[in-house]
Regions:
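Phosphate/nucleotide-binding beta-alpha loop and adjacent structural elements of enzyme active sites
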Residues: 1-255
């Protein structure tokens, strides 16, 4: 009975993964012994291209989140010109947005070196995607990875004035200035608790220049994260939808 139960769970996992990647890859990646180091390529159905992930890491969970559960499916009608993917990880959400909104320019921002390397490779050949190695913050201050031993999708940053190899901090106004756009149509935030810092100071300056926010809130990592964010959001009229771990905020066009 134990063997039968294990087989059923394995088949269920394969069937679920095959909604987002090829059947062959779903079988192979489920049967593989994870080592956390080697890379493998998966054929993603909706992209008609392969992506590189690291078996044994959180990358496969991200494949499930983005391409199986489609947690970044946008519930509001929009034709974005500029999408900013802050906390882009290895580029899976970036690729999802590029597929759904081929006319949009996408800036993908990721601070952690190994994730950034895969982000660049996974998005290679896409002329509308520009990767930046940086972190989003509320001011210009040197940053470092606060938890280098964390899972690949859970790296967070913290100020470190004396860091020898600091990560560049970018504010939202700086991103807009560098992009050449006056507004961000979709701002995706998956920044592992840094959303509290981002909204705690100066966000009143840039929130009127953002049309939609897609974010994952991280109260499990950062105290009063949601309270800080919503205390600022509530100064502006908006509609909200929730899909999986993501909150979708659509601002009133007249704000």
């Amino acid at each position: 009975m134990l063997l039968l139960g294990s087989l059923r769970r394995t088949l269920s996992k394969i069937e679920s993964l095959a909604r987002g990647i090829s059947w062959a890859d779903a079988v192979r990646i489920t049967a593989a012994k994870p080592n956390g180091c080697a890379e493998t390529n998966l054929s993603v159905r909706m992209l008609n291209r392969q992506v590189t992930i690291r078996p044994g890491t959180s990358d496969l969970r991200c494949i499930d989140k983005v391409f199986v559960e489609q947690e970044y499916w946008v519930p509001f009608e929009t034709t974005p010109r500029l999408i900013v993917d802050a906390g882009a990880n290895i580029g899976l959400a970036t690729l999802y947005f590029a597929s759904k909104f081929p006319g949009a320019e996408i800036i993908a921002i990721e601070p952690e070196p190994s994730n950034y390397d895969l982000l660049v490779r996974n998005c290679s050949g896409l002329t509308n995607v520009t990767p930046w190695r940086a972190a989003v913050w509320n001011t210009n201050i040197p940053l470092k990875i606060a938890n280098p031993d964390a899972e690949k999708f859970a790296f967070s940053v913290t100020p470190e004035p004396n860091a020898t190899s600091a990560i560049e901090a970018l504010t939202i106004p700086q991103i807009l200035d560098k992009s050449g756009y006056s507004t961000i149509d979709i701002l995706k935030l998956d920044i592992e608790g840094a959303e509290r810092e981002l909204f705690s100071n100066g966000c009143e300056e840039w929130l009127p220049r953002v049309r939609m926010i897609i974010m994952e809130l991280h109260d499990r990592y950062t105290t009063a994260c949601s309270r800080t964010v919503y205390s600022k959001l509530c100064q502006f009229p908006f509609r909200q939808e929730v899909r999986g771990e993501n909150v979708f905020i659509l601002f009133d066009s007249e704000q």
